[in-house]
């Protein structure tokens, strides 16, 4: 399957705008579950305000949050897809800039030292574009995540020792949620990476944070850890926006990687309550948009 780069550019633009305006169905369902179970009156009121904000944004074709975030694209390429990687990356970059200039959107991207903003949401190594490969022959999947600073500023890595065991992982995750408090705009999706090298562990935490609600870690030990950590986090009483309550997190998601015999790294990356994402799937039949 040959990829039309003009279509890719248009999709990259459309995905950024869609992600900022339309919340995925699984997140809306997550809100409904938390609202039904919440016992704290103030927390219930805060959840209701969040739910109304999402509905109003959708009805008025507005953004769910003023923070347009850092633009992150995950690209999965099927084995029979014909495309030049550099051309694909350039098309996504053009689409990202067009979304910002043509919508228009606030550009949240600046030079890390000079803090200069060129108002395109692009810059050095930005948008962040991550490539993976799939056995699905004629399919190209592009997923867009606008990552807000409230959740992204609350990211951690700890190079734990194997002798500390699983209890150290659990304690670290719980401590991170406590330290974050309301700064991540909870209820959050808590992404946890365990294992690998330092850089891989952090990347796993990010991919865990942006997984759909209801998904489970493929490894049974990871899935067990997810359930235990979700219970632990929601017993902390942080609550929506850090104002107290049962609804601190929609879920804790865990991703694992094999690691060195003398290491056990653990990383935490969070997604705020506006858990925004959008996707485009390219096949020989055309382009399909989703989440």
Residue ranges and their predicted role:
Residues 1-192, 197-291:
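Non-transmembrane, aqueous-exposed alpha-helical and coiled segments at domain scale
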